Amino acid sequence: MDNKISPEAQVAELELDAVIGFNGHVPTGLKCHPDQEHLIFPLGCTILIQAINTQEQNFLQGHGNNVSCLAISRSGRYIASGQVTFMGFKADIILWDYKKRELLARLSLHKGKIEALAFSPNDLYLVSLGGPDDGSVVVWSIAKRDAICGSPAAGLNVGNATNVIFSRCRDEMFVTAGNGTIRVWELDLPNRKIWPTECQTGQMKRIVMSIGMADDDSFFYLGTTTGDILKMNPRTKLLTDAGPAKDKFSLGVSAIRCLKMGGLLVGSGAGLLVFCKSPSYKPIKKIQSQGGITSITLRGEGHQFFVGTEESHIYRVSFTDFKETLIATCHFEAVEDIVFPFGTAELFATCAKKDIRVWHTSSNSAHRIGVTAIATTSDCKRVISGGGEGEVRVWQIGCQTQKLEEALKEHKSSVSCIRVKKNNEECVTASTDGTCIIWDLVRLRRNQMILANTLFQCVCYHPEEFQIITSGTDRKIAYWEVFDGTVIRELEGSLSGSINGMDITQEGVHFVTGGNDHLVKVWDYNEGEVTHVGVGHSGNITRIRISPGNQYIVSVSADGAILRWKYPYTS
């Protein structure tokens, strides 16, 4: 009986401790919960529920790929989220219970991508819009967790519908809009049908980016790629007015929100946040933010609201003085590296293409400084740097002076990883030319070269420093003898994709790896077996580190996410 159990069965799950990041590219992805205490937003395939005051986090995990849209019911009881998947495959919608933080139902009908979701005002129905390959609109019963009916979202001679919004008063009416199409739908429950009526805009042809409904259902407003706003009447299905006539919003109206007191909050693709009123739509108040605005979410009636941008900034704005406060910021592109300072687990630094950020581990907060990437000796007197051309440079650093001691030219391709021995007399560099070189830092020359048929991505010294472990694009983890460069053993590190990051504990008992399979794996060094697996990244993991003192594992990925995991063993 025992021999049938797969080795994967004994692998424990790694506990996710904290997430730093926000995917600002999801339209209306940032939501303030009706309890006014929590922000809800997607990051990769995870949905974060974060307390506004205490920053405490909960995670909703269940999607197999990136979350593409998010909706919260008006009562706050339910959250719905949709995902992207591969062409031809079914994309899931997941219905979550907010209070219990658990999955209620998985709704699968659409193919490829879920474009948008909306709840009816009394939590009776959920409407979903499929992506370009799917093109259908489906109404789901929340009580039965099943589809009521569906229909093609747009006519034959127009583009795709990309936005959906429910009526604020009636459970039977909703609006879809997109490229050249604006439709008001009526749900006919006894016959299980939805009936569309095309809205007339005359000569005006527009691509709709965002949509907002007035509280009394008197009008709905459409933000367009042209940079103007259309005001439509849902009863007559006619255009009431459009504007502004001049000075349209640059890069389109990407977010729109109706306020109870009258007027609109409008966000543009150029990062301009504006309060304006029909029919002129001229700015009454305005703020410039960093990155195109993708979400505006009200806290309560709108006395305070939150704004999310493409550059992963979250702002809090109070309506009365219209001043913004940056409350969260993180990398919006691939994170390239992580490093902990010597002997402290309190801080760590991450770098992306354009910025370096230093984070405080327990509070996950950051400040911005310059841009570079280096490896240092523990006495801080030398810096060893590797370049894209394969050169390894040793620099001597004094209080006022920086001197290049030696340029070591052996590698033929870029240096991907540098590790320094504890006594600062030796270092190892891994390169994508398929070599690892062990350098003598006293005589500044090569000690040993290791060759393999792979592009090396990472290397680690075992703490006793007579062995090194390497991994790279061939998915194998190799143990090597430092003295003569011979291979001791090879492990199959991943079933799919390169291993990009690796780190080893101070005792050398366990090590961690991460790569293109999006999994964080904890290994037993001597047994060569996986003991724990962490699922949470949806981009390729680029680097991984264990904090000094073995409290946390921090992993970063190509989608800009930083995940902090609880280290599974007590040191």
Curated annotation (Swiss-Prot):
Its job: Microtubule inner protein (MIP) part of the dynein-decorated doublet microtubules (DMTs) in cilia axoneme. Important for proper ciliary and flagellar beating. May act in cooperation with CFAP45 and axonemal dynein subunit DNAH11. May play a role in cell growth and/or survival.
Subcellular location: Cytoplasm; Cytoplasm, Cytoskeleton, Cilium axoneme; Cytoplasm, Cytoskeleton, Flagellum axoneme
Gene that this sequence comes from: CFAP52
Organism: Macaca fascicularis
Gene Ontology CC, one term: sperm flagellum
Family the UniProt entry places it in: Belongs to the CFAP52 family.
Extent of the signal sequence: none
GO BP field: flagellated sperm motility
Keyword Cytoplasm: yes
InterPro entries associated with the record: Quinoprotein_ADH-like_sf, WD40/YVTN_repeat-like_dom_sf, WD40_repeat_CS, WD40_rpt, WD_repeat_EMAP
Keywords, in A-Z order: Cell projection, Cilium, Cytoplasm, Cytoskeleton, Flagellum, Repeat, WD repeat
Subunit and interaction comment: Microtubule inner protein component of sperm flagellar doublet microtubules. Interacts with BRCA2. Interacts with the CCT chaperonin complex. Interacts with HSP70. Interacts with AK8. Interacts with CFAP45. Interacts with DNAI1. Interacts with IQDC.
Keyword Cytoplasm set for record: yes
A Pfam family hit: WD40
WD repeats: 62-106, 109-150, 156-195, 288-327, 330-364, 366-405, 410-449, 451-490, 494-533, 536-571
Entry protein name: Cilia- and flagella-associated protein 52
